[in-house]
Regions:
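Secondary-structure boundary/capping micro-motif
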Residues: 2-210, 215-243, 248-383
Length: 383
C-alpha cells in the first residue's frame, strides 16, 4: 500500500485503523467509511480462572509478595510444594504458571491484593562516652560485597506506650547476602542485647567479620567494644541522626519484624517466648524462600529518580553464588534447604502469630475491665 499510494507507513496505518474515516482532498475523496465503527481486537485469555485459583494459595504461602519477586522463585516453589503435596496442578496449569510473567502475576492478583490493603517509633537513646573509640563507617575497612559484614538495630514492641520495660527485637542483617537473623529480649539492657548478639552469631552460616550499629547505648558500650576487639570483628557506627546509614537493617525492621509481629505491646515472659519461637521459623522462611531485590544504581535526572535493581534472589541463593563462601558451608545450607517446606513454615508462623494476638486481646480485655471498675459509681451500678 505504501508503494502504491506513496504514503508514509505510519500515516497509512492511521488511516486503516480509522476504519474508513473520510479523508477529502479538494473534490476527491481518498477514503470513505463509518467514523463510529472501530475494529476491536479480541485476544483469547491465556491465564484463566484455573490459573488464578492455583496462583492465589501459592501467593499466600509466599507471604503476598509482589509479582517480580514471586516470578523469580515460582518455578522452584512449585517444585517444592508438589514434593510435599501441598498443591496439585494439571499439566496445562503447571505449564502456564512456569511461564507466567511478573506483570501478569500482579494483574491477576490485583483484586486479591486490594482485599488485603502505623508506623514504628524509635526508642534509641544515645550512648556518648565511647563514641570517640568507635569509628564512623568510612567504607575503607568495610566490605559490603563479602558475607559477614552486618548491620544491627533494635525494634521496640511498646505498642505506642514507651513507659516501663517491654520486649525488643535485635535485628541483624548481612549487607551482601541480605541474610537476616532476629532474637527478642525482655528489654534494651546491654547484657540482654549482648547475649542475643552472641546467640545470633552462632546461627549465622558465615563468619561474623564486621558490625555496624546506630549510636544507641545498647550497642555503644564496653561489653560489645571489648568483645569485637577480642574477636577481631570490625565495629563501626552510623552518623548521629542519619538513620539511612543503616538502610539495610532499617528495611528489614519492617519487612521482617513488623510484618511478622506488628505494632502491639509485648512485655511478658510468655510473649517473649512466643516471639522467639516465631523467629525460629521466620529465619528459615525468610532466608530460604523470600526473594530480595537489591538496589544496583540510582540516577537523578531533575525531579525524576531512576532506580535499577538486580534480579530477585533469596539470601540462600545469594550465599550459594558467592565464591568466598566455603563448599562446606554451602553443603550445610543445601542440606537444610532440601528439608524445608515453606507451606508448613507459613502455617506454623501463622499459628504463633495468632497466639501472640490472643495474649494482646486478653490484656486489652483486662485493661478495659479494670478501667470500668475504677470509674466512680461502678459499685452502685453493679448492685
Amino acid at each position: 500500500m505504501v508503494d502504491l499510494t506513496g504514503y508514509n507507513r505510519w500515516y497509512a496505518v492511521g488511516l486503516l485503523r480509522g476504519d474508513g474515516m473520510a479523508i477529502r482532498v479538494g473534490r476527491r475523496v481518498k477514503l470513505v467509511g463509518d467514523l463510529r465503527k472501530r475494529v476491536k481486537r479480541v485476544r483469547p485469555r491465556l491465564y484463566d480462572e484455573a490459573v488464578l485459583e492455583k496462583l492465589k494459595p501459592i501467593w499466600a504461602i509466599m507471604d503476598f509478595i509482589c509479582g517480580k519477586r514471586l516470578a523469580a522463585i515460582l518455578p522452584e516453589v512449585i517444585q517444592i510444594l508438589e514434593k510435599y503435596r501441598e498443591i496439585e496442578l494439571s499439566g496445562e496449569v503447571r505449564t502456564k504458571l512456569l511461564a507466567i510473567s511478573a506483570t501478569t502475576i500482579d494483574r491477576l492478583l490485583a483484586a486479591e491484593r486490594r482485599k488485603w490493603a502505623l508506623r514504628g517509633r524509635s526508642g534509641t537513646k544515645p550512648g556518648t562516652l565511647l563514641k570517640h573509640q568507635i569509628p564512623i563507617r568510612t567504607f575503607t575497612e568495610w566490605n559490603e560485597n563479602k558475607a559477614g559484614f552486618v548491620e544491627i538495630d533494635m525494634v521496640g514492641h511498646d505498642g505506642g506506650d514507651s513507659s516501663g520495660d517491654y520486649c525488643q527485637t535485635l535485628d541483624v542483617t548481612d549487607v551482601a547476602s541480605t541474610w537476616t537473623e532476629t532474637e527478642a529480649v525482655i528489654n534494651k539492657a546491654q547484657v540482654w542485647v549482648f547475649d542475643a548478639l552472641k546467640s545470633i552469631r552462632t546461627r549465622l552460616p558465615f563468619p561474623l567479620l564486621g558490625i555496624d550499629s546506630d549510636n544507641g547505648s545498647e550497642f555503644i558500650n564496653n561489653h560489645l567494644l571489648n568483645y569485637c576487639k577480642h574477636e577481631q570483628i570490625t565495629f563501626t557506627r552510623g552518623r548521629a541522626g542519619k538513620k539511612n546509614d543503616g538502610c539495610f537493617v532499617e528495611q528489614k525492621n519492617y519487612s521482617v519484624v513488623r510484618r511478622a509481629v506488628g505494632y502491639a505491646r509485648y512485655d511478658s515472659l510468655a510473649q517473649l517466648r512466643l516471639l522467639n519461637a516465631l523467629y525460629e521459623r521466620l529465619r528459615l522462611y525468610t532466608n530460604y524462600f523470600q526473594p530480595v531485590m537489591k538496589l544496583v544504581s540510582r540516577e537523578r535526572n531533575g525531579a525524576k529518580v531512576k532506580k535499577k535493581h538486580d534480579e530477585p534472589r533469596t539470601p540462600y541463593q545469594r550465599l550459594m553464588e558467592m565464591p568466598d563462601i566455603s563448599p562446606k558451608i554451602k553443603k550445610r545450607l543445601k542440606a537444610e534447604y532440601v528439608t524445608l517446606n515453606p507451606a508448613q513454615l507459613k502455617r506454623e508462623i501463622t499459628e504463633l502469630q495468632a497466639k501472640l494476638l490472643k495474649t494482646v486481646a486478653r490484656r486489652r480485655r483486662a485493661q478495659i475491665s479494670t478501667t470500668i471498675r475504677q470509674q466512680p459509681g461502678h459499685e452502685n451500678r453493679a448492685t
